[in-house]
Structure formats: structure tokens, C-alpha cells
Swiss-Prot record:
Gene: udk
Protein name per its UniProtKB record: Uridine kinase
MF GO annotations: ATP binding; cytidine kinase activity; uridine kinase activity
Gene3D superfamilies to which the protein is assigned, alphabetical: P-loop containing nucleotide triphosphate hydrolases
Location relative to the cell: Cytoplasm
A GO cellular component annotation in the UniProt record: cytoplasm
GO terms for biological process, alphabetical: CTP salvage; UMP salvage
InterPro entries, per the entry: P-loop_NTPase, PRK/URK, Uridine_kinase, Uridine_kinase-like
Amino acid sequence: MTENKHRRPVVIGVTGGSGSGKTTVSNAIYNQLSGQSLLILQQDSYYNDQSEMTMAERHAVNYDHPLAFDTDLMIKQIKQLLAYQPIEKPVYDYEQYTRSDKTIHQEPRDVIIVEGVLILDDQRLRDLMDIKVFVDTDDDIRIIRRIQRDIKERGRTLDSVIGQYLATVKPMYHQFVEPTKRYADLIVPEGGENEVAIDLLTTKVRSIL
């Protein structure tokens, strides 16, 4: 990392519904700015510690509600990174539905990509961002992607994924996620496949650095 003596790191917020392509967009930004000092910070890492709850209680939690996240910790650690201080990033265990005992040591970088479904819901988080991006993708495509991801990567069953989508993911998207589109500086249709939007975004970041 080369510390910028004239300003703090640049923070890019990437949000959108579950399965919208946020990770693809974040990775595309990361790859296009590969000559820079970057890191990706995912909101999913900051789900609440639920180790004191039973497994049945954990299953009943609405993971698509803002209160499911330890936003205070996320804000604290972003501020540490903005001050060029390292952090111990939490690790979330998707199979146990709680935070792992492990952490990941993360050194500060000149560009911080913050990714998550609800990162624009909290004004304190928005105020830390230089550029805010909303990835806008059709509902049908998002649910198909979520089913494929959760079964393959998170050990979920088809019934549990569909049940969660209908019970919480879809209604919470319309209640909390979609309204945050108004805070976005850039709305990206078609996610990471939108090369024009990615080029515009990375050009803007280079102009700030």
C-alpha cells in the first residue's frame, strides 16, 4: 500500500438486491483498478454474533432486515481503515448461522469497496462513501442466482432458499433495499455485464486518486 498523504482512502459502496450481481461488479472494479491498492469489504461479514442463540432461534432470524447486521462494528472498522489502521474483520459461518471465532487480518488500502444489500440504508455508512452504486437486476434473474449460490456455496436446500426468499428476501428488498436506489450516484443495469458503467466508474475513481 502507498499511503496517500493528501486525503483518506476512496470508498465505493456497491449495493443492490440479493443475486443482483454486486459481487461481480465489485470484482470487475477490483480487476480494472488492479494497479491500485484495493480491498473489498462485504456487509455479510458483519452479521450479528448469535452464538448465544439456539439453532432454532438462529433459523428464525430475518437476515434481510437492517437489524440483522452489526452496523456499528462495520462503521467502526471502516473508520479505522480510513485512518490507515488495520482491522480484524469478522468471519460469518453460513452453515452455523452465526459469527465464527476466526477473524481475518486486513491491512488498509487506498480504495475500499464496500459491498452489501443494505449498505445505503444507514446514513452513517452513506456518509463514509465517495461513490455509491446500485446494481439493478430483474427479480427473476436475482432469485435464480440466489438459489444457485446458496445451494452450492452455503449448504442450503432448495426448499429453504425459496422459503426464505418468499418470507423475507423479497418483502425486505421492496421495503429496505429498493428505496435506497435514490441515494445512488450510479445505477448499473445488468450488473457486472455492463462494461460501460464499470468503465465510467473506474475512470471516476482514477480521477480521485
